[in-house]
């Protein structure tokens, strides 16, 4: 490929990262959304037709485009990660199957003599790409929860309050992600290196991207179908 990496043999996410997304990131907010209070103007709306199912045109449209949105943002994070310039890459070493930043390891020369090996730049790029994809997917889904609470009104009008269970679930899920990022032993389990500053800025931007995109769709009234 352009970056010297054969992308046919790597994946944007590792199995342990996917498991975390399914069990923690998705589960907690989903349960809390079940007790989200009704919208204030709900009694002013026309009653739904009896034959109208759950999967309306509008809901189907949002599932499709918002799912693709999250998917593309995650893939973009991975691609940006593997495109990190060589001069910004951290030095990494593999010890007993786990990857460490060289700065975290004492007696590097002795570790290498004992069988550890320094990662080449291509391997480091893959590690950074997978880390960015995981962080972006985990946190952007939590951010996106606030988008889906109201299909028409801006998040800046509805706010993020009104459901303490939801706010707590998102806070816990986000805090657990940061625990993984801050504790070296957990970072090693999830194969997440310490990201360069430029990658951190790019990651934060992608995490917030769902709010920008959905707000634009709401502004131009294309987040909903005509019959909604």
Stretches found by the model and what they are:
Residues 1-152:
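Membrane-embedded transport module
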Residues 34, 90-112, 119, 130-131, ...:
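C-terminal transmembrane module of polytopic membrane proteins
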